[in-house]
């Protein structure tokens, strides 16, 4: 049921089932672990009878932002479709020519946390309020309405919330410092900013200083590739032949192609394939 929202454990079970059902075209393995020691699973899909060096490697990576659970579902759907339709002549041709590496959840800790509250970062332990206890003032659904609310200071009238100062997040103030939810279960690190290429070049959210208390919601981290999830992903890409890569998100309805940090330069050899990528992106959109 692709309309369902699966837990990370359920996704693990689905991956294992695909690998068990289609052993001739799949291989399931972990490329590393998260801060909370959840596996970063990769389902490799290809015709194993044909040598890997004769094929093009395609990466389908998803859920680097924990709350974007639908991106994981899209990656899982890709794996499901390729395996289910592997007897189809068209799909057979794909698996003869390509090795597809599907990593549906890059941020498993953030994925699980997002069932409590939408959480973009991973769960590197963080002491945001300085009491020497990581995550000592997490959010909680105090009123039991099924939502964790942002709290604003002001009168309960028709004033738009965007015009009111933020008081905190729904929390019983576990640490007793008068600031609600100022040490939540979040690292504040956006792992999509932490790769060692173009690290922190355009860390827009950080530069805007979006904070509650002293918590920056999205930063590039203290240094390039500080997070175990990103270290594992980069090492995987170094060790495998990845010729093309699709990273799946849910933030906007668009298809992005290189380069997002500078304009296209027709005289730059690195940009020779950009017109082709633009054409493919237009077809996908």
PLM features: what roles do these ranges have?
Residues 1-285:
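M14 metallocarboxypeptidase catalytic domain recognition
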């Amino acid at each position: 049921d692709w309309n369902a929202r699966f837990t990370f454990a359920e996704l693990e079970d689905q991956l294992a089932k695909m690998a068990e059902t289609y052993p001739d075209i799949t291989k399931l393995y972990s490329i590393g672990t998260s801060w909370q020691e959840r596996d970063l699973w990769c389902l490799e899909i290809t015709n194993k009878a044909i040598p890997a060096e004769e094929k093009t490697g395609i990466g389908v990576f998803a859920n680097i932002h924990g709350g974007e659970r639908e991106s994981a579902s899209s990656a899982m759907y890709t794996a499901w479709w390729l395996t289910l339709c592997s007897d189809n002549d068209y799909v057979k041709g794909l698996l003869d020519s390509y090795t597809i590496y599907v990593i549906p959840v890059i941020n498993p800790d953030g994925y699980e946390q997002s069932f409590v509250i939408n959480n973009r970062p991973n769960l590197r332990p963080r002491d945001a309020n300085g009491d020497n206890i990581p995550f000592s003032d997490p959010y909680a659904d105090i009123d039991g309405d099924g939502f964790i609310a942002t709290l604003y200071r002001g009168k309960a009238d028709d004033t738009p919330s965007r015009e009111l100062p933020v008081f905190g997040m729904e929390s019983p103030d576990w640490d007793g410092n008068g600031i609600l939810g100022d040490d939540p279960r979040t690292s504040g690190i956006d792992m999509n900013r932490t790769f060692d290429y173009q690290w922190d070049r355009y860390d827009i959210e950080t530069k805007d200083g979006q904070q509650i208390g002293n918590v920056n919601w999205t930063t590039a981290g203290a240094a390039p590739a500080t997070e175990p999830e990103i270290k594992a992903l980069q090492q995987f890409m170094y060790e495998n032949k990845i010729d093309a890569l699709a990273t799946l998100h849910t933030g906007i309805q668009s298809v992005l192609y290189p380069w997002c940090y500078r304009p296209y330069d027709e005289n730059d050899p690195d940009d020779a394939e950009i017109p082709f990528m633009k054409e493919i992106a237009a077809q996908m959109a």
